[in-house]
Amino acid sequence: MSMSAFRIRCVAVAALFVATAATVAFADPPPAAQIKPRQDKLRDMGGALKAITDEIKKGRIDWDNAVIPNAQTVKDRSVYILNWFPKGSGPEAHVKTYALPAIWQKFDDFTKQGKQLQADAAKLQQVANAKDEAGLKAQVQTIGKTCKACHDPYRSPDYEKDNEE
């Protein structure tokens, strides 16, 4: 084998190694590893909605420091919600999760619910940015119903017991 052919083979092997390493480095984490980040993001969304509700209850709404940024959080998180439930990230992952198997058994309905949340969250951000108090109150109720419509069939009742304040 000539030196030139040897160099070409070495370069080809090195390129294959780099491509394989890059693929492994950028691959999605295993489903079980996605449960905790999913739970954290969902808690962020719930906390943001609670902060907005608390502002409404106060009777004096701080739009710029409380409502608008929290509405943005809800909208930003909602955009990705359907990506947070890959197959294998339910109870079969053997990691504590409140996600019920029904999510994957009825994924078309779950997707529909997720898209409704995305639309409601976008509307929440719109009324927040407009500083529309009546619109905000109505949209918070709407998004609460959307959350409940998904939580009832797809989240374990253990969540409420484990997260009592």
Stretches found by the model and what they are:
Residues 15-17:
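Short, linear, compositionally biased motifs with a strong N-terminal bias
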Residues 32-64, 68, 72-73, 77-165:
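Sequence context surrounding c-type heme c attachment/ligation sites in exported
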Residues 26-28:
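Boundary of Sec targeting at the N-terminus
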Residues 2-13:
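Bacterial N-terminal signal peptides that target proteins for export
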Residues 19-24:
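N-terminal signal peptide c-region/cleavage motif recognized by signal peptidases
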